[in-house]
């Protein structure tokens, strides 16, 4: 049995998609990779990403322009609206999120309020704003860190309610929410959460989570409640059903569904890489998410983004040494962009790299653009000996054929590698 390891560098984009400026015109200039390399204040040491072909996909003076390794390198469009970690990972694993509903909470206040009251909760508007206060302290609101209308949050102070209570409220919201994700968030803040409410883009209103202190005060608890999906038609479940061991690492352990998977949740990059390396020593599928790049993007901290990228690169060097059997695969990609120089703290809608190390291949292949992150999951399925048709979405590169379970994204391009 072979090993396939997918490493998702959260927020690592390689240039704006054509529709990146629909919400914020300035986002057409987004280029997370290039701007981190340009503005980090020093030359970043990224030998593994260079060997994996990042410089072929995104030419830059700071990246190697050739590689001796048998890699396939390209980039992928996101394949879902907006720029969101949850939607990105679900799409990557084979879900079709292309028609996910984008909606502000203001458009569904009556439905959400009625559901919460029916569940026995006290519900009020906060000073007439389109935001709900539940049981006097828990806020149901637009998520201000993603593109408007992609996600809603249910946020509470752990000084006021247990996380189980906050999560229960979020589950009730999820029953009527049309959006991709309802996120239950519990943390510690020194003042009532109403003190940190602000307006966001496109008339959204919500908790300013970074300002609340949730991220810096410790004890943060988060659970993502996604739109209803057939998880049996996603890569982790497909692999597990075939008897292939599955390990989910970092944020992937929190947002992907697979009852049989070993879960290794972690935020520190050193822990994510250690768990990934440990799991990669055994046959099976490993999906790992490095979250700290995304956090640096939200903080608009270019230097921190570069530091984390170097940490990731060091881990990738170890994985390249480890995954040396003919059918092993290391796939490095992203889920969206998060350009720390763009002038705001939101994700950016960018292409992401798709860098595949395949020890059995004869040389380097430059891949055409994939139309969706679902193609990454379909390609990983093929490398594990699985039929990508078992996924709900995605086009796999494969030997002498292309397997499509959704629209063909490559406009008849020949298969780029065996």
Where are these regions (language model features)?
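Feature captures the catalytic ectodomains and active-site-proximal regions of enzymes
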Residues: 1-418
């Amino acid at each position: 049995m072979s090993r396939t390891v997918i490493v998702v560098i959260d927020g690592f984009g390689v240039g704006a998609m054509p529709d990146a400026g629909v919400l914020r015109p300035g986002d057409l200039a987004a280029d997370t990779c290039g701007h981190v390399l340009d503005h980090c204040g020093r030359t970043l040491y990224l030998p593994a990403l260079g060997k994996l072909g990042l410089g072929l996909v995104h030419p830059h003076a700071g990246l190697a322009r050739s590689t001796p390794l048998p890699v396939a390198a390209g980039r992928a469009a996101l394949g879902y609206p907006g720029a969101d970690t949850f939607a990105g990972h679900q799409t990557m694993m084979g879900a079709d999120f292309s028609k996910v509903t984008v909606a502000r909470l203001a458009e569904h206040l009556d439905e959400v309020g009625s559901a919460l009251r029916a569940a026995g909760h006290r519900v009020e508007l906060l000073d007439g704003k389109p935001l709900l206060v539940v049981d006097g302290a828990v806020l149901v609101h637009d998520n201000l860190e993603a593109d408007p209308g992609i996600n809603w949050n249910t946020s509470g102070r752990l000084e006021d309610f247990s996380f189980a209570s906050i999560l229960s409220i979020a589950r009730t919201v999820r029953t009527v929410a049309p959006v991709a994700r309802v996120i239950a968030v519990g943390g510690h803040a020194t003042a009532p959460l109403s003190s940190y409410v602000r307006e966001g883009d496109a008339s959204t209103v919500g908790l300013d989570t970074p300002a609340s202190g949730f991220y810096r005060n410790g004890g943060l608890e988060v659970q993502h409640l996604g739109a209803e999906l057939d998880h049996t038609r996603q890569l982790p479940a497909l692999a597990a059903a075939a008897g292939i061991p599955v390990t989910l690492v970092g944020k992937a352990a929190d947002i992907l569904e697979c009852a049989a998977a070993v879960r290794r949740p972690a935020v520190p990059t050193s822990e994510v890489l250690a768990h990934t390396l440990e799991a990669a020593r055994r046959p099976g599928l490993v999906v790992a998410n490095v979250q700290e790049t995304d956090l640096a993007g939200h903080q608009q901290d270019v230097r921190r983004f570069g530091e984390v990228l170097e940490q990731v690169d060091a881990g990738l060097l170890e994985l390249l040494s480890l995954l040396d059997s003919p059918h092993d695969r290391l796939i490095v990609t992203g889920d969206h962009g998060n350009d720390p120089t763009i002038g705001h703290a939101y994700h950016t809608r960018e292409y992401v790299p798709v860098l595949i190390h395949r020890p059995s291949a004869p040389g380097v292949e430059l891949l055409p653009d994939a139309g969706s992150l679902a193609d990454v999951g379909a390609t990983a399925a093929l490398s594990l000996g699985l039929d990508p048709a078992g996924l709900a979405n995605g086009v796999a590169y494969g030997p002498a054929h292309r397997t499509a379970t959704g629209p063909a994204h490559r406009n008849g391009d020949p298969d780029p590698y065996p």
